[in-house]
């Protein structure tokens, strides 16, 4: 994917990437539309679209419950389910199309292929984990985990920063790399007519592989979020 200047808007000292905002909103709307469509006219005996929605929900619960614990699982199940669905959609948006203006502005990309978005999302997840930990355990008991034993305090603080950074960089590296190679294959197909069949075939295979990787990254991000959250609300017990 070649470098391009995305359209932006300036609000005071803050610059907003309009492409990133639009694609993030699109991902949210797609998730909402899917859940709304699948949950309409729900019955006690699920089938079809309702069955698919419940399967996805149970899937998320199954791989996160061990980290959160049965005591608090019902409080965070919808949060984790929504996070997983959003990431599945957001990770794959950039693979669906390649849209650029004549001046090279990229108008279609995965939100998670942007490091600023991933760092912001990771920061928000970290903040939620800390806030929920304090709310569930109390400030004094929560703070004690950082200073007991005393010689581990620097390592405990460093761990918070490494968790925050790794959560963002892991998903960014995988999604961005997928879009870069996909973009290069599209560019190759434009070089000459005889390159097109090769580029098309390779891009088809790579897109399928990237969809798989994107779903795996959504799984990993949600799993790690549940691990961090479970550790904060349950302590080291």
UniProtKB/Swiss-Prot annotation:
Family: Belongs to the ATPase A chain family.
Signal peptide: none
A Pfam family reported for this protein in Swiss-Prot or TrEMBL: ATP-synt_A
Membrane spanning residue stretches: 18-38, 77-97, 114-134, 167-187, 208-230
Principal location class: membrane
Record-given protein name: ATP synthase subunit a
Source lineage: Bacteria, Bacillati, Bacillota, Bacilli, Lactobacillales
Any single biological process term in GO: proton motive force-driven plasma membrane ATP synthesis
Subunit structure: F-type ATPases have 2 components, CF(1) - the catalytic core - and CF(0) - the membrane proton channel. CF(1) has five subunits: alpha(3), beta(3), gamma(1), delta(1), epsilon(1). CF(0) has three main subunits: a(1), b(2) and c(9-12). The alpha and beta chains form an alternating ring which encloses part of the gamma chain. CF(1) is attached to CF(0) by a central stalk formed by the gamma and epsilon chains, while a peripheral stalk is formed by the delta and b chains.
Protein's membrane topology: Multi-pass membrane protein
GO terms under cellular component: plasma membrane; proton-transporting ATP synthase complex
Highest taxon listed in the record's lineage: Bacteria
Gene Ontology MF, one: proton-transporting ATP synthase activity, rotational mechanism
rRNA-binding in keyword set: no
Organism in which the protein naturally occurs: Streptococcus gordonii (strain Challis / ATCC 35105 / BCRC 15272 / CH1 / DL1 / V288)
């Amino acid at each position: 994917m070649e470098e391009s200047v995305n359209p932006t808007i300036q609000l005071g000292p803050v610059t907003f990437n309009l492409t990133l905002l639009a694609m993030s909103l699109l991902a949210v709307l797609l998730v909402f539309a899917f859940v709304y469509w699948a949950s309409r006219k729900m019955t006690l005996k699920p089938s079809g679209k309702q069955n698919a929605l419940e399967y996805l929900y149970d899937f998320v619960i199954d791989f996160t419950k061990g980290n959160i614990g049965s005591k608090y699982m019902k409080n965070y199940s919808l949060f984790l389910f929504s996070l997983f669905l959003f990431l599945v959609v957001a990770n794959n948006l950039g693979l669906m199309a390649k849209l650029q203006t004549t001046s090279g502005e990229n108008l279609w990309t995965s939100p998670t292929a942007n490091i600023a978005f991933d760092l912001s999302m990771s920061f928000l997840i970290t903040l939620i984990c800390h806030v929920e930990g304090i709310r569930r355990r109390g400030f004094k008991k929560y703070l004690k985990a950082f200073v007991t034993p005393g010689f581990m305090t620097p390592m405990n603080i460093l761990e918070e920063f490494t968790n925050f950074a790794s959560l963002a960089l892991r998903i960014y590296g995988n999604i961005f790399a997928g879009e870069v190679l996909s973009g290069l294959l599209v560019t190759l197909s434009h070089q000459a007519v005889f390159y097109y069949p090769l580029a098309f075939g390779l891009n088809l295979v790579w897109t399928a592989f990237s969809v798989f990787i994107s779903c795996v990254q959504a799984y990993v991000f949600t799993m790690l979020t549940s691990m961090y959250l479970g550790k904060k609300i349950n302590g080291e017990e």
